[in-house]
Amino acid sequence: MAGGPPKALPSTGPQSLRDMPHPLAGSSSEEAVGGDSTPSPDLLMARSFGDKDLILPNGGTPAGTASPASSSSLLNRLQLDDDIDGEARDLFVTVDDPKKHVCTMETYITYRITTKSTRVEFDLPEYSVRRRYQDFDWLRNKLEESQPTHLIPPLPEKFVVKGVVDRFSEEFVETRRKALDKFLKRITDHPVLSFNEHFNVFLTAKDLNAYKKQGIALLSRVGESVKHVTGGYKLRSRPLEFAAISDYLDTFALKLGTIDRIAQRIIKEEIEYLVELREYGPVYSTWSALEGELAEPLEGVSACIGNCSTALEELTDDITEEFLPVLREYVLYSDSMKGVLKKRDQVQAEYEAKLEAVALRKEERPKVPADVEKCQDRMECFNADLKADMERWQSNKRHDFRQLLVGLADKNIQYYEKCLMAWESIIPLLQEKQETK
């Protein structure tokens, strides 16, 4: 990305929080509340901000004698853990093979989605369909409508700044493909979202547009109820555990935004330094043509600088393509979680308003109406699902950032090792010239 113009694209489930019982899964509301072993918000916050949040597998101790080999073996070990976890899965989805389509009215990219599963919900063991970005967007909207109590993974941002990024370049398409692949894999790993009817159709239907026009697939009972909740109810006070989650998400997004801005400034400076290196190296090469005895050492210095510039370009590309997208994904993730929190607050506000209205009735034998009980069920459902998704999100976050930071360290080690080898390679040449004198 740092060197030359962009290449053109050729045309053509985890358990819930502490196994917490769902309030609508057959147990009474009292049992669900009484048997709740959910960690306190302070514990969640400690997991998030404490040393365990982004701790490295080696305990976080400085590795003064670390080498690229040791860091690479660490990456391999993390990958092995993923393979072991994957042995228990029964649904695998992959996004690959992007293709550019040029039509009269528009130009767009489609991606091949390959699905392999042993679930009874699928008629065939394997499916292969092609989808474009707007199909992914449709899926996410449908999941939000039908599963409002759950955290829906974010999609990569659709729009890019015109003139800054070519959305049909090979680099941009590959970055988006990785993001879309991660989006589907997060849904696949979810114990509820992966069984959603819309998700099944998205993975299997040859003609998705026909399904969209039919407008079938009714909303769930909980989803339909939440959809009709108006914003006319005012929440008195948010429970402490959810207030702590909201505060954490605000701080988390702020920190990631700061890291993203600083990383982009570093990349900009590295690109400027790379331009200078590319002009600096050839100077020694042209100088060598004017020298006799110094010609070979000068050519060696020129080649050394060229190797260093290549290593720097690789490091810059890795940070741009691997590091920054993860930061932006989790900023969007925190926004999605805030959206679910707001929906939960609306349901709680509705429940409080209805409960207060019942209390104001002067009856000898007050009886809680059915609609109030249903509203209470929805609120407890929201609480349980949100807590479970928050724990799942925290677990994924720790895993993703562990891999991200280990990978960043590994790439930096490789960069400095390459520069060291390049400069060390010309030392014998310079010593040889000194001895000949």
Swiss-Prot record:
Biological processes, Gene Ontology terms: positive regulation of autophagosome assembly; protein transport
Entry membrane topology: Peripheral membrane protein
Keywords: Endosome, Membrane, Phosphoprotein, Protein transport, Transport
Binding site for a 1,2-diacyl-sn-glycero-3-phospho-(1D-myo-inositol-3-phosphate): R132, Q134, K162, R176
GO cellular component, one term: early endosome
Transmembrane segments: none
PTM sites of type Phosphothreonine: T38
Stored SUPFAM superfamilies: BAR/IMD domain-like, PX domain
Residues found modified as Phosphoserine: S40
Domain PX: 89-210
Subcellular locations according to the entry: Early endosome membrane
Keyword Transport listed: yes
Source superkingdom: Eukaryota
GO molecular function: phosphatidylinositol binding
Pfam families from the UniProt entry: BAR (PF03114), PX (PF00787)
Residues of the BAR domain: 234-437
Chain positions covered by the region annotation Disordered: 1-45
Homology family: Belongs to the sorting nexin family.
Subunit structure: Heterodimer; heterodimerizes with SNX4.
Described purpose of this protein according to its UniProt entry: Involved in the regulation of endocytosis and in several stages of intracellular trafficking. Together with SNX4, involved in autophagosome assembly.
Name of the featured protein: Sorting nexin-30
Natural source organism: Mus musculus (Mouse)
